[in-house]
């Protein structure tokens, strides 16, 4: 289960109270949770999905999520336009349709307000009631910021990766719509 198992463990560690539905074609359980054999087997379309499969399979997963009404996805895999893979990122954008995606080549989003981590590691962060949202193209930058001990409460950490669908302005605007966000760091 790899990276996806890490995401499940981080949500559990942060006390996320919402449903978490791992999907794996052969495993019955991941991280102590029932695993579903396919997206079609889920109880309903997920609000948000961390996609931890290779770049070629990511396109198919995004298409299936979009068709079932998924709320959005983090596309973790690398090897898209940043590595010269011609046309694959355009296929991903077409597969997403109207569904927002962060990435590809994206580490994800951490929501310390609600304990929802679509991110493989939280790097020592803690739950907060309000705080700053940090946004970067590069996961490395916000990871390094998140590993620092600061007096500044961090509400969100988010990466854009290749920003194939959701761009900086759209993500920043969505984070600022949360009244618990006190400032935005880019």
Language-model features and meaning:
Residues 1-186:
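Catalytic-core regions of core metabolic enzymes
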């Amino acid at each position: 289960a790899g990276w996806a198992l890490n995401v499940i463990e981080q949500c559990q560690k942060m006390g996320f109270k919402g449903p978490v539905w791992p999907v794996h074609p052969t495993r019955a359980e991941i991280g102590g949770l029932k695993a579903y054999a396919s997206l079609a087997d889920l109880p309903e379309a997920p609000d948000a999905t961390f996609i931890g499969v290779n770049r070629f399979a990511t396109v198919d997963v995004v298409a299936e999520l979009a068709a079932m009404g998924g709320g959005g996805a983090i596309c973790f895999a690398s090897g898209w336009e940043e590595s010269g893979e011609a046309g694959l990122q355009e296929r991903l954008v077409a597969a997403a349709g109207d569904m927002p995606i962060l990435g590809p080549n994206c580490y994800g989003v951490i929501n310390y307000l609600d304990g929802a981590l679509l991110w493989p590691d939280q790097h020592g962060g803690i739950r907060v009631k309000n705080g700053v949202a940090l946004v970067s193209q590069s996961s490395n930058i916000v990871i390094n910021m998140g590993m620092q001990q600061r007096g500044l409460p961090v509400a969100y950490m988010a990466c854009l990766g290749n920003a194939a669908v959701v761009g900086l302005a759209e993500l920043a605007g969505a984070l600022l719509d949360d009244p618990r966000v006190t400032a935005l760091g880019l």
